[in-house]
Amino acid sequence: MTRIGIFFGGKDNGGTAKVAKKIQELLGKDMATIHNVEKSGTDDVNKYEFLILGTAAWGIGEMHSDWENFIEELIEADLASKKIALFGLGDQVTYPESFVDGLGTLFCRLPFKQNVVGFTSVDSYKYYYSTAEKDGRFVGLAIDNDNQSELTESRIINWVEQVRKEFKL
């Protein structure tokens, strides 16, 4: 059984799914399994020791609609002993006042925030405001494929290595 569940909201061929697949590739398919939250439930979450949760911005910085439905399942899951890492996609140029706010909303809705790892630097981004920023850091990996696609792969690689250490794998 794999130890890490990667859960994403959105289309199976969308940007969030592509990031989830890259994360899985870096961790190894023997370590991580991908789930679309649209097709997942509490039992899927409960079978993993570690969780990686990903969302795209939806509307103006909102959490993807699939997450709105799944968040209740997640809240009912046994999260007390699980380490959790988050990632989110956004557009800092078109929506600088709500950059990766879906990521921030996901973090805010989670119980056991103390179990969240994988915080990242806000340096190299240009935005006005983000609910995903806490104490000068993002609550997870922030991806802007619209304006900084050339940085996406290295950001994912560095973040996965950080999360691997914080998960103690």
Locate predicted features:
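A short beta-strand-loop structural module common to alpha/beta enzyme folds
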Residues: 30-41
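Residue-level recognition of beta-strand->loop/alpha-helix junctions
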Residues: 7-8, 36, 88
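FMN-binding flavodoxin-like domain, especially the glycine-rich phosphate-binding loop
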Residues: 18, 26, 30, 47-169
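N-terminal beta1-alpha1 ligand-phosphate binding loop
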Residues: 2-26
